Amino acid sequence: MIYGITKQILDALSPFLSEEDVEITAEKHILDDGSAPEYGDKVILDKENNVWFEVFENEIVLFYFTDHEHFDDYMERPRDGEPDYVERATDFLQRLFTLELRKTETVAGSDMLKVEYAFVFPDGSAEFLGGTWKQIADAEPRNEVCVSTWKFDKAQKKFSQKTE
């Protein structure tokens, strides 16, 4: 591991996974602009379901299923009392492991697919995380919604999915 932050995050996830359950590699990223390469710790939490994160010098990028989140403080520093990027990333990961994550895919017409994610709390309320639009090329227009829910299975040490 290059960064101590990686160990800090793994310690926070220890109720769910141990270091033996994950794959950790040091990554070197060559940048297109010719500047010095960036180095990161890549930690694969659930390879089958594309759940992993990478820690850089001042940023954490978290990938989950078909989406991802960036956590950093260089765009805007946290105000007094606000959590820093490490705390925000750790909180997100802990919620990913303890709450259900709902994925809603909506096809409208023949050329657009919208994908949205939301954390679902025990009381049924949800926190919208964001969404993306993808270009598709269907021959026939259609209106379709597919909802699936992801939840961490502690016994199997991986995420499982159910489609509604």
Regions found by a protein language model. Give the residues of each.
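Long, charged/polar, surface-exposed segments that mediate recognition or autoinhibition
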Residues: 65-104
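A short local loop/turn or secondary-structure capping micro-motif enriched for an aromatic residue
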Residues: 62, 71-73, 136-138
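Hydrophobic residues embedded in beta-strands of well-ordered beta-sheets
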Residues: 59-63, 70, 126
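Short amphipathic alpha-helical segments
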Residues: 1-5, 9, 81-88
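A short, sequence-level motif marking secondary-structure junctions
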Residues: 58-59, 79-82, 132-137
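Amphipathic alpha-helical segments
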Residues: 2-23
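Amphipathic, interaction-prone secondary-structure segments
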Residues: 20-62
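Acidic, proline/glycine-rich low-complexity IDRs
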Residues: 94, 98-164
